[in-house]
Every structure is written in structure tokens, then in C-alpha cells.
Amino acid sequence: FNQKIKKVIVAVPERAIGSSFKKTKLSEYGYFADWDYNEDNNLCTPGGDEKKVRAFKNFMENKSETILICTHATLRFAFNQLDVSVFNETLVAIDEFHHVSSAIENRLGEVLNALMQKTNAHIVAMTGSYFRGDSLPVLLPKDEIKFTKVTYNYYEQLNGYTFLKSLGIGYHFYQGRY
């Protein structure tokens, strides 16, 4: 891994998303590493939260394990049972980042804040829409400036798809406070 990263955690909002991840030979396309992980570390499978939290904790303790895939909920529950320092030298990628909020009662936002303030973890924030649907900010301005924004328009993104059969794009307009 680069930049002294020893572990990667990918957190997705739903099991269906994470369970669709497959091993991929990225090195064939010029990347320095393949997407290759221990399938036991894909926690986006049916089963109870306690078992998944235990597996998450075991992953963090095992120096030879490097990639874990879990839901936002598993990340939140496991975070409650771990010392924040175990996330040092870890890349935490949060898919559907607009689920985060700077509001005090947003648990995913609290986890993110602790990672940013108390560790050297790298954060990758991924979302197709930075819009939450309410008036709460995803991040406070002091935190947002810490991120490097990478934006692709639909045409740039679609050029990367090889097997896309169809795509539907909808627009929704809101009035008043949302």
C-alpha cells in the first residue's frame, strides 16, 4: 500500500451493494495492486450484527488482513467497541457519503468526525449526489476544506462503463424548505 496505509475499510449503506463486490485484476489495467480480499472480510452478508462486529474487530487486530467491506451500520457498531487509535494508517472509504451529516445525532457523522480529529486515517468520500434532502450540511466548512474534490460529469463517468445496457436519469425539483 502507498502512503503508509495498512488497511482499507469500504463502508456501503446496504448489504446488496457490498455483496456485489468481486475480486478484480486491476494490475492488468496499470494499477499497482489488484482488488483482492479475503471473502470472510466481506461483512455484507446475511447474519447478525454481533457476529459482524466481532469479525470487524478481528480484522482490525489481524495485521495480515488488509481489506474489509461492511455496511455503514457495521462500521458504526464496531467503532463503538474499538479504541479510535486502531484506525490509524487505515483508509476508510464511505460510499453514499451524503448519509453523513454534521448534525450531532448522526452517528456516521460522529464516527467520521472522530476519525478526522483523532487519527491519521485517510477518508474517501464517495457520492453521486452531495444533496441530503434536508437542510443539514454533510460536513462543516472547516472539515469540507480538508477534502480534495474529484468530480465527473455524466458523460465522463459513462465513458468508463463497458457493459452498461441502459441508464435512466431523473430530475426532481423541490420547493420551500427541504
Q: What do the predicted segments below correspond to?
A:
Residues 4-36, 74:
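Conserved Walker A/P-loop ATP-binding site and its immediately adjacent core
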Residues 30-77:
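Inter-Walker segment of RecA-like/P-loop motor cores
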Residues 122, 133-178:
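Interdomain helical connector at the RecA1-RecA2 junction of SF1/SF2 helicase-like NTPases
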Residues 72-74, 83-124:
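SF2 helicase catalytic motif II
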Residues 15-18, 73-76, 98-99, 128-133:
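Conserved nucleotide-binding/hydrolysis micro-motifs of P-loop NTPases
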Residues 1:
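Walker A/P-loop
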Residues 12, 94, 127:
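Short beta-strand/turn micro-motifs composed of small residues
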Residues 20-28, 92, 107-114, 138-139:
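Alpha-helical scaffold elements adjacent to nucleotide-binding pockets in ATP/GTP-utilizing enzyme cores
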